Amino acid sequence: MVTTALNTTKSEEIFSAAQKLMPGGVSSPVRAFKSVGGQPIVFDRVKGSRVWDVDGNEYIDYVGTWGPAICGHANDEVNAALRETLEKGTSFGAPCLKENILAEMVINAVPSIEMVRFVNSGTEACMSVLRLMRAFTGREKIIKFEGCYHGHADMFLVQAGSGVATLGLPDSPGVPKTTTAATLTAPYNDLEAVKKLFAENPGEIAGVILEPVVGNSGFVLPDAGFLEGLREITKEHDALLVFDEVMTGFRISYGGAQEKFGVTPDLTTLGKVIGGGLPVGAYGGRKDIMSMVAPAGPMYQAGTLSGNPLAMTAGIKTLELLQRPGMYGQLETITKKLIDGLLSIAREAGHEVTGGNISGMFGMFFTGEPVRNYEDAKKSDLHKFSRYHRGMLEQGIYLAPSQFEAGFTSLAHTDEDIEKTLAAAKVVLNNL
């Protein structure tokens, strides 16, 4: 059973059958609930801030399909736009006007992006941007940070976060050593470690890629001066700075983390929010760099479904909604109320916790020590988190089934949702 209080018979039956059809019974590892125990619930439908499972149980959702549902699930305006586009076709395999519209919106919003290429996922965006980094600089080595996740491509599965961290894996079998030999790693928030890597590899490093706000080791903020320091170091060594804003883009501010912190990278990857719930990714940056991408330049990258009209439509409408006055203030207010309440309740119940938020992105660790990087995140009491997760599920609150994933609010969450969540947390944390 997933819980003791909920009837999840149908979820169990479906998941049992799924395990005979798909590896682990899921299409993405974290969904299997391995780090929190029990079997996953199977969703039937979603709307606004709520999700319903196949047994009819209703939950307040703080996963938001892992970030894209910033306007709430099945937003009426997004759905209406999709229905209109659907009548014209789902995929053209040729240019469409909606690509221009979304591209212009992205370019106008994100400080670093002068040109953009649409792809089908965040993983694809990061794979492509790595190839571009190497093509532009003529160098092969890159620096990534421990616990930062940039998708499941071979060259990034070194000290990765997200599902890799959830399963307790340092990397993955099947990745050739030669593929990751050029991937250097440093602890997040450690500028001295980055300087050391540049000193040890003079003229060989193409650039640095990172999540400007980490969401795949749990929620970890950059120290004051960290992003600025990376910008200075990369400029000093004629290397590129790349922000993986698949998670933070259009979520923590309309212009992403780079707008929020005032640090402009050379290249940026995007996903999640810009697809409005449909599969999408993008990478973009300075025009002189992006001009190397085929067919304008020699660096090849392509995709059958890239820029398809449905994904473009959902992205356009989502960004239009986010442009309305007060949207990000609303996200900040409601998310701060949530995380401040959770931390207060946990501490009053005698638990050592730390956490925070930035706009509609938040996290809480079961440790009293500050969390500045992946090693700090691993000090969280994972057994306690798993019991907390199961308890909240019983109370009708759906949280990410991993300590190493950030949580998300949406514009559909209400004060009543937050109050119900905090009331549930009080019950769970006082009995943990």
From Swiss-Prot:
GO terms assigned for molecular function: glutamate-1-semialdehyde 2,1-aminomutase activity; pyridoxal phosphate binding; transaminase activity
Keyword Cytoplasm: yes
Keyword terms: Chlorophyll biosynthesis, Cytoplasm, Isomerase, Porphyrin biosynthesis, Pyridoxal phosphate
EC number in record: 5.4.3.8
Catalytic activity: (S)-4-amino-5-oxopentanoate = 5-aminolevulinate
Enzyme class: isomerase
Subcellular location: Cytoplasm
Needed co-factor(s): pyridoxal 5'-phosphate
GO annotation (BP), single: protoporphyrinogen IX biosynthetic process
CC terms in the record's Gene Ontology section: cytoplasm
Pathway listed: Porphyrin-containing compound metabolism; protoporphyrin-IX biosynthesis; 5-aminolevulinate from L-glutamyl-tRNA(Glu): step 2/2; Porphyrin-containing compound metabolism; chlorophyll biosynthesis
Pfam families per record: Aminotran_3 (PF00202)
N6-(pyridoxal phosphate)lysine found at: 272
InterPro entries per the UniProt record, alphabetical: 4pyrrol_synth_GluAld_NH2Trfase, Aminotrans_3, Aminotrans_3_PPA_site, PyrdxlP-dep_Trfase, PyrdxlP-dep_Trfase_major, PyrdxlP-dep_Trfase_small
SUPFAM superfamilies assigned: PLP-dependent transferases
Keyword Mitochondrion on entry: no
Description of how the protein assembles with itself and partners: Homodimer.
Family as reported in the entry's similarity comment: Belongs to the class-III pyridoxal-phosphate-dependent aminotransferase family. HemL subfamily.
Protein name as annotated: Glutamate-1-semialdehyde 2,1-aminomutase
Species the sequence originates in: Picosynechococcus sp. (strain ATCC 27264 / PCC 7002 / PR-6)
Gene that produces this protein: hemL
